[in-house]
Amino acid sequence: MDAGAQLDAFIDRYSPQVASDGRRALSFLEQRLPTATRLVYDNYNALVVGFGPTDKASQAILSIALYPEYVRLFFLRGIELNDPGGTLEGKGSQVRSVKLHPISRIEGADIVALIDSAVANAYPLPRTGKGKLIIKAIAAKQRSRRPAA
């Protein structure tokens, strides 16, 4: 199974709403960052797809994480971003995020400005070509991908 088919199978384990939202968020970032390498981590708590210039996780700029009830956009160096509207959440030393509910929020001017700023301040993406999709890790043990009943 190729990486695209594997990613689709990972997403299909979520509820129809979260799967649809996750695909929409990923498609939005793929269109904005067509040369980015996408790194997939099917972790214990969530399915995470990082976007960066290379296959090194340390150079990832953004990531989309699918949780059982929602999708979240992470800015891996979010602490460095100018966020006058207070859009970003988090208190850690580096990462900031935003819950994408409704999913159309990813297309809002505030989020797009943060995405553009994160990309502008990161290690540069390739200028040409199409980014690769790489399955980096699949956790043997995982939480349910569906909300608790």
Regions found by a protein language model. Name each.
Residues M1-A149:
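Charge-dense, helix-prone N-terminal extensions
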